[in-house]
Amino acid sequence: MTAERTEITVVGGDKTGLIARITSLLFERGINIEDLDQAVRDGLFRMSMRVDAEGMTTEREELRTALAELGRELGVEIQVRFPSDRETRRLAVCVTKESHCLEAVLDAAADGDLDVEITAVISNHGTLRSLAEAHDVPFYDIGDDSGSPDEDRMLEVLAEHDIDLIVLARYMRILGPKIVFRYEDRIINVHPSLLPAFPGAAAYRQAKEKGVRIAGVTAHYVTTDLDQGPIITQRAFDVPDDALIDEITARGQPLEAEALLEAIELHLSDAVAVHRGRTSLRDGVDPERYQLGLTRAAQAANPTAPVDREIDRQEIEGGD
């Protein structure tokens, strides 16, 4: 087990001395903290730690038990994750009504292109139930008559299936901090724009109205700030002068699925590190096999350094 693979997450009410109590318990068991981050949103406290457990002087289950008991005493939930515990990750897909991304993820898992077990499809509408059930994946409709999701029920489903990764495959609702904090850097969303441009709803329409020449899609980790999480992959496409919204959407949707699948594969391969809001490839990852951002073809067409060329100064200035 490597230090970077051991994560501890604390979620609950803020309390004086909480951090000291938890870190002391870890130090007493030979666990060194390599990175610690904390935040408060809507009255909910979150602390995440990456720890070096190679010198741990206790068993894993004893550590989990001790932290759970301390969490109950402090009124918080403490999770310990050893991703090396499982060879196959468990994935939940959240959707609303659009099917193209869900279908792509289900097909990729069924074909073995993604080394993952999809154990739940969660939605705020019942529209895509038949698609999930056709792939023998349990479907959970957590929305009311207006489509508002019950996030407490979502948390129950995620816990019931012991979910490692949540994929928002065109899920048209904003996740609250009670979910985002518990699954930090484990929720991937695909958004139909080249973020940070055009966040929020109707991104293709926003792009059309602003007259952009190039539009695109972004797969990113989810944070409590809408469409501002660390970017994993992006795809771009040309927007013709006379393109209608439906035509832009038709160009973008296949790329949404492509960017999302690549982001999932990068995450499952443990190739992505996140630091201060930016993704990077982990040390030791083969850059020829994995990459972040645009495809190599797109990068080749957009050089990072100016291209030298002869310029006819008189022609530019209108001289003879």
Question: Where are the predicted features?
Answer:
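Short glycine-/aliphatic-rich beta-strand segments at the starts of folded cytosolic domains
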Residues: 2-12
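Short, surface-exposed ligand-recognition loops at beta-strand->loop->(often short) alpha-helix junctions
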Residues: 10-18, 95
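Short, well-ordered turn and helix-capping elements at secondary-structure junctions
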Residues: 14, 35-37, 194
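Short amphipathic alpha-helix segments
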Residues: 15-34, 67
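N-terminal glycine-rich anion-binding loops that anchor highly charged ligand groups
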Residues: 30-44
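One-carbon transfer enzymes
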Residues: 42-44, 48-320
